[in-house]
């Protein structure tokens, strides 16, 4: 049977490394490990590129600055939150940090943009104003006397009206009593006529039967 190695040349490949290329001669000991950080990279000199001179460069620079300013004034520009103060002041709520929709002069062609991006003008809510009514002057003695006179005249008028109503009621009651008396007299006369014409005391009863007394009476 053949051995597992299959001979001397069938093993792993031998690695050859030239130590002299690193700066170490034959028989020299290896240098000790360095425990210090590696030296820093030398600083680079950042020199600005010379600006292009001419009308084209100035136009591009002005256009770029205008675009940046317009982007910062849009409501979609995210700004860092303002830190809240420990002590709130009365004027803080009236100082608006963000831009107002009415102050944005941006009128693009909205037919080419979606409706969601269209700016909607917000209406500021008006604060409720309290109406201060003028104070009425205090009533003087003359005003009091006038009111008392008016009340007295009203009382007199009411008394006159009530007295007239009472008189009318009394007249109506008297008329009703007179009508009732007349009605009673007429009824009394009718009753007496009926008594005089139809009353029979029974004296004439049996006058014709005296001639036939012989008959038996049961």
From Swiss-Prot:
Task: Name the gene.
Answer: POLR3GL
Output compositional bias ranges, type Acidic residues: 161-193, 201-218
> Assembly and interactions?
Component of the RNA polymerase III (Pol III) complex consisting of 17 subunits. Pol III exists as two alternative complexes defined by the mutually exclusive incorporation of subunit POLR3G/RPC7alpha or POLR3GL/RPC7beta. Found in a trimeric complex with POLR3C/RPC3 and POLR3F/RPC6. Directly interacts with POLR3C.
Q: Where is this region: Disordered?
A: 130-218
Q: Which domain of life is it from?
A: Eukaryota
Where the protein is mainly located, per its record?
nucleus
Tell me the leader sequence span.
Answer: none
> What family is reported?
Belongs to the eukaryotic RPC7 RNA polymerase subunit family.
Subcellular compartments: Nucleus
Q: What is the lineage of its organism?
A: Eukaryota, Metazoa, Chordata, Craniata, Vertebrata
The name on file for this protein is DNA-directed RNA polymerase III subunit RPC7-like
Summarize the protein's role: DNA-dependent RNA polymerase catalyzes the transcription of DNA into RNA using the four ribonucleoside triphosphates as substrates. Specific peripheric component of RNA polymerase III which synthesizes small RNAs, such as 5S rRNA and tRNAs.
Q: Name one GO biological process term.
A: transcription by RNA polymerase III
């Amino acid at each position: 049977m053949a051995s597992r190695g299959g001979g001397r040349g069938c093993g792993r490949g031998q690695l050859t490394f030239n130590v002299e290329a690193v700066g170490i001669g034959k028989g020299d000991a290896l240098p000790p490990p360095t425990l210090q950080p590696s030296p820093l990279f030398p600083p680079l000199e950042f020199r600005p590129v010379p600006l292009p001179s001419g009308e084209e460069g100035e136009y591009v620079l002005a256009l770029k600055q205008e675009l940046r300013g317009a982007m910062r004034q849009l409501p979609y520009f995210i700004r860092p939150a303002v830190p809240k103060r420990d002590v709130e002041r009365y004027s803080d709520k009236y100082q608006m940090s963000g831009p107002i929709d009415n102050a944005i002069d941006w009128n693009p062609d909205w037919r080419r943009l979606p409706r969601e991006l269209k700016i909607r003008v917000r209406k500021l809510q008006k604060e409720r104003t309290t109406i201060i009514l003028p104070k009425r002057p205090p009533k003087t003695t003359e005003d009091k006397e006038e009111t008392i006179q008016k009340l007295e005249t009203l009382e007199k008028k009411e008394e006159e009206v009530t007295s007239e109503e009472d008189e009318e009621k009394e007249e109506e009651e008297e008329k009703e009593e007179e009508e009732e008396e007349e009605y009673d007299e007429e009824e009394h006369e009718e009753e007496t006529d009926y008594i005089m014409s139809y009353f029979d005391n029974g004296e004439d009863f049996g006058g014709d039967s005296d001639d036939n007394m012989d008959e038996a009476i049961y």
